[in-house]
């Protein structure tokens, strides 16, 4: 057990002491109050953890990963997170879908995607990657609907220093947020602090 006045500080302290490669948080939503408490803990860990954080819904049933969605802003830091993600996906030969949701006022989405695809191709040889550019003024709702439509096994995001995409996701009402993404596991990397998963990648 972790004895600490702050749940977050206690978890982070132990993770650092043990040099943990990941933190796994279970999410059991028995009532609305518990949703808020658990959601607050998980959300705070995203920005303070020394390693990647997994948020796992209580009713998750183990199955080999087949479809992984990485919610991207098509920025350089995404490259390094995706490279770590590919190491994890490689033993399963899972498909990584790099999804960007652009608003109707954002005219550079397609240009960014082409640049990012070329950049990623130089840095990573993993074969099972595809790109999706979605248009919507309601980023959270569109992402949730996409996850439902495509039967996704894992959602991956990058916690950035300037927040950006993940802030747009987490900024919404806490209960609604938990209800939305707690249907599938969520993995969050921190910018400049994503770790390798210690798999032996074959990049097939």
Please describe what each predicted stretch is.
Residues 35-36, 66, 81, 107-111, ...:
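Short, well-ordered secondary-structure micro-motifs
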Residues 1-23, 124-175, 180, 184, ...:
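Structural beta-alpha unit
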Residues 28, 73, 104, 160:
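Flexible loop residues that form catalytic
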């Amino acid at each position: 057990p972790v004895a600490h006045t702050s749940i977050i500080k206690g978890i982070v302290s132990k993770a650092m002491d043990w040099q943990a490669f990941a933190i796994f948080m279970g999410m059991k939503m028995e009532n609305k109050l518990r949703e808020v408490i658990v959601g607050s803990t998980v959300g705070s860990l995203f920005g303070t953890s020394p390693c990647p954080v997994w948020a796992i819904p209580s009713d998750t049933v183990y199955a080999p990963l087949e479809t992984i969605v990485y919610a991207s802003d098509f920025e350089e830091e995404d490259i390094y997170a995706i490279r770590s993600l590919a190491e994890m996906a490689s033993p399963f030969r899972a498909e990584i879908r790099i999804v960007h949701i652009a608003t109707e006022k954002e005219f550079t989405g397609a240009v960014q995607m082409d640049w990012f695809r070329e950049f990623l191709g130089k840095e990573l040889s993993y074969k099972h990657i595809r790109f999706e550019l979605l248009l919507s003024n309601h980023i959270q709702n569109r992402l949730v609907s996409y996850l439902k439509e495509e039967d996704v096994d894992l959602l991956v995001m990058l916690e950035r220093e300037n927040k950006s995409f993940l802030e747009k996701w987490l900024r919404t009402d806490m209960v609604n947020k938990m209800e939305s993404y707690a249907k599938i596991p969520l993995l969050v990397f921190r910018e400049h602090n994503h770790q390798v998963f210690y798999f032996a990648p074959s990049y097939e």
